[in-house]
Amino acid sequence: MTEIKKYSALNDLAEKGGTVIFGGKEDKDIPLCELRQAFELGSNYYNRSFENLSIENAAELYLSSVAPLAPETVLLHIGENDLDLFANNPDKFLELYRELVCKIKSESRDCYIAIVSLKNYDNDSLIAKLNERLKYLADSERCEFVDVSQKKVWNPRSTKDAISFICSLGFVRHLKSHEPVYDLARTLFCYA
């Protein structure tokens, strides 16, 4: 896979720590540098998204492309390519997702994990069920769940001001990252 080779070469240059987006085809084109500049996001941000990421190959790809970065935070946005699997065998999908979360925790005990829902702007019942199960999984595994399923009125300027204000007061989560994860994920996954 050329993506793995590309990410391996980038990982050799990257600083360890920071926040990693681990998602699918939709996430590969997130304009991370531009959003980082526009919202004055601190820390290091890396996008390790794969065109054909599935929950069935996620653990292997995580180990080869994300784990070497020793991330402080991982934003998991997985499921886009797994709708058929979820429709036919939701328990297997959730079992594989839980195994991925456990693998991340075993690789880095202090890594903060956020599970990001799938977008569901058309109110698809299958995606709604998948997101519901992802929320349950996040709760049971003590991960943060970020719901980006519905279009929301979003004012980028007020989000930027709110993030800046909260951080200036010192209200940050217990790790080193300086942005609240929910607002960070909304910024990264809902910019368009």
Model-based region annotation:
Residues 1-20, 27, 32-33, 37-41, ...:
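N-terminal secretory targeting modules
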Residues 2-95, 125:
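Conserved SGNH/GDSL esterase-like catalytic core that processes O-acyl groups on lipids
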Residues 46-49, 115, 147:
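Structural signal for conserved beta-strand scaffold positions within catalytic alpha/beta enzyme cores
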Residues 53-56, 151-156:
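A short acidic, often aromatic-flanked loop/helix-cap motif at beta-alpha or helix-coil junctions
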Residues 59, 90, 94, 98, ...:
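Short, amphipathic alpha-helical "lid/cap" segments that border enzyme active or binding sites
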Residues 77-81, 105-129:
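Active-site segments of SGNH/GDSL-like serine hydrolases
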Residues 91-116, 133-143:
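Charged, glycine-enriched surface loops/patches
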Residues 120-151, 159:
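Substrate-gating cap/lid alpha-helix
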